[in-house]
């Protein structure tokens, strides 16, 4: 049986959470994967080199600040310039596949923003890369209906884990149904193998967070945060971190607590799927 490995992104370490919480969470994610019997591989750029698995010293340096954020459009340039960077979902998906890691755990994927139009590179990366991604759905700040439509158009296999509806990141439920459901890690592994045999792209396994927040309440906070961003002229790559920061303020830190929980739950599920997959291959 081949070694079950789980890729983990490093943007949560460099841009997702404040120091030292970011380092604490990144280390906890790796430990959660190990506890389930798989090997964690946090992916990042360190001084112009791709690292698949980080030392404690490298994690500390990335968490302390000053690192870039690497997506597909600037990945080559950052490497050529010798920079250090946290990897987004899109970059992590690409690099994990290059290094033969078929399972990746994250919090939430990027998608389609409502206004002005802005689409994450995560969607195209998922469509063209045969990898299984465990997440709690698209980030709560996105247009879920439009994101689900784009995933369908791009041919990404969206599968609910013990749910018939799309999780909305902080919320375990939303009004939008998913096209397929599985109830065990083994079922998820079999879907991935079928997708790979068919030459399809990625499988997005959406895992509802336990003890999440009500969908309607989060939607109100997102609307208010969006108005703040519009007033302050925030857009582009600055928009997502701005909105997530405002959601934390509006919820008195509750979204941060749920974010940590869902990251850990997704890491554990990804490890279980990786173990099932290793037993099938």
Swiss-Prot record:
EC class, as a word, reads lyase
Q: Which residues form the active site?
A: 9, 139
One Pfam family of this chain: Indigoidine_A
Taxonomically, the superkingdom here is Bacteria
Residues spanning the signal sequence: none
Q: Which GO terms describe its molecular function?
A: hydrolase activity, acting on glycosyl bonds; metal ion binding; pseudouridylate synthase activity
Output the GO biological process annotations, alphabetical, semicolon-separated: nucleobase catabolic process
Kindly list the cofactors needed: Mn(2+)
Which of this chain's residues are annotated to bind Mn(2+)? Answer: 118
The keyword Metal-binding is assigned to this record: yes
- What does the cofactor section's free text say about binding? Binds 1 Mn(2+) ion per subunit.
In terms of InterPro entries, this protein maps to: Indigdn_synthA-like (IPR022830), PsuG (IPR007342)
User: Is Iron-sulfur tagged as a keyword?
Assistant: no
Question: Could you tell me the EC number(s) of this protein?
Answer: 4.2.1.70
Query: What cellular component terms from Gene Ontology apply here?
Result: cytoplasm
Question: Catalytic activity, per the record?
Answer: D-ribose 5-phosphate + uracil = psi-UMP + H2O
Q: For substrate, which residues are the binding ones?
A: 69, 89, 120-122
- Family assignment? Belongs to the pseudouridine-5'-phosphate glycosidase family.
Which HAMAP family does this entry report, sorted A to Z? PsiMP_glycosidase (MF_01876)
Subunit info here reads: Homotrimer.
The name this protein carries in UniProt is: Pseudouridine-5'-phosphate glycosidase
Species whose genome carries this gene: Thermus thermophilus (strain ATCC BAA-163 / DSM 7039 / HB27)
